[in-house]
């Protein structure tokens, strides 16, 4: 069975890429309008959660469709876009690579190539001037940090200039499968928003079932996953613990309350200390659902060369040199 790695070349190739501009082109007005719609409408829907549920417009069918869509698209981001496409934490079979890219696109957080370019840029300049979404961008005063938190959480999405894909994601630009998913991003965004309504309507054979499924598994699911993902950029660079060493200036932290909803992404301090590690919650007791999914992929033979944490490497990265870390199983 053929597996594929997403390579991030080093040496001469990396030096040549570093000479390319930081950004390329601008988002079109049409793109910005679509962005406003997919950011604003799910967010506004979140305010209607209690009255809609209280009014009896929530069924077991809605919950089931919501759960399936949240897990599939959430793992598309955490396992697919992030740990695989961005950081090459494992190699994947071709069908798994494409499936993960499609699932990530259906989270409506950007096309695979642009998402990866933004994130690799973030790691290269984490919490420095060229970081696309640092909460410390406007200083550490109350006013500056408040403005920075909004910028890191959602404001940066509306920046006109785009991270240069040729500089930060040349491997994906050369990947024909990923480029096909890029081109289908708009269609996949509409599909993920309205497919729940179709399923809900067919299961209940009613317009009400279609409407409530659209609300819960479409709007609410997209909105919740958006803000959980964005909280990694904002909250997890301000609040939480930092037991692992990072590059000077980097403020990535572990924020346990988001561990389950983010599928393990909120163990952000270790991730910035060791970006290619397939498990972010490396210590015992740290829930990392994404890592468990990768483990399952490995058991089925769909993922190989998984970069699992090792005690010696984890210990070497800990600030407390006397610590004796017990790794998660």
Where are these regions (language model features)?
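Short leucine-rich amphipathic alpha-helical surface patches
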Residues: 239, 264-265, 271-272, 278, ...
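Helix-loop boundary elements of multi-pass alpha-helical membrane proteins
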Residues: 89, 238-243
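Non-catalytic, topology-defining segments of multipass membrane proteins
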Residues: 1-230, 235, 277-329
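Active-site-proximal inter-transmembrane loops
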Residues: 169-177, 241-267, 273
């Amino acid at each position: 069975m053929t597996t594929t790695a997403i390579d991030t070349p080093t040496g001469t190739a990396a030096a040549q890429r570093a000479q390319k501009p930081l950004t390329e082109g601008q988002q079109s007005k049409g793109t910005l309008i679509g962005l406003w719609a997919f950011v604003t409408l799910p967010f506004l829907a979140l305010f209607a959660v209690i009255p809609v549920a209280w009014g009896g417009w929530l069924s077991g069918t809605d919950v089931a469709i919501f759960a399936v869509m949240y897990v599939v698209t959430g793992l598309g981001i955490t396992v697919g876009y992030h740990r695989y496409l961005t950081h090459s934490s494992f190699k994947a079979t071709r069908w798994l690579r494409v499936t993960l890219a499609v699932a990530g696109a259906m989270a409506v957080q950007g096309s695979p190539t642009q998402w990866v370019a933004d994130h690799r840029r973030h790691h290269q300049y984490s919490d420095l001037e060229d970081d696309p979404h640092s909460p410390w961008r406007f200083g550490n005063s109350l006013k500056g940090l408040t403005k920075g938190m909004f910028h890191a959480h959602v404001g940066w999405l509306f920046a006109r200039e785009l991270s240069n894909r040729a500089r930060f994601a040349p491997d994906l630009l050369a990947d024909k499968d990923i480029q096909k998913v890029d081109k289908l991003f708009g269609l996949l965004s509409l599909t993920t928003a309205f497919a729940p309504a179709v399923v809900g309507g067919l299961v209940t054979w009613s317009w009400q079932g279609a409407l409530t499924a659209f609300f819960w598994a479409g709007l609410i699911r997209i909105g919740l996953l958006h803000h959980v993902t964005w909280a990694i950029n904002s909250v997890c660079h301000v609040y939480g613990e930092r037991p692992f060493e990072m590059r000077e200036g980097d403020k990535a932290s572990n924020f346990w309350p988001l561990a389950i909803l983010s599928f393990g992404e909120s163990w952000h301090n270790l991730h910035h200390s060791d970006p290619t590690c397939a498990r972010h919650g490396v210590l015992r007791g740290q829930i990392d659902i994404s890592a468990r999914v990768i483990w399952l992929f490995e058991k089925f033979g769909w993922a190989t060369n998984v970069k699992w944490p090792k005690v010696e490497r984890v210990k070497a990265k800990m600030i407390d040199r006397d610590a004796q870390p017990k790794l998660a199983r």
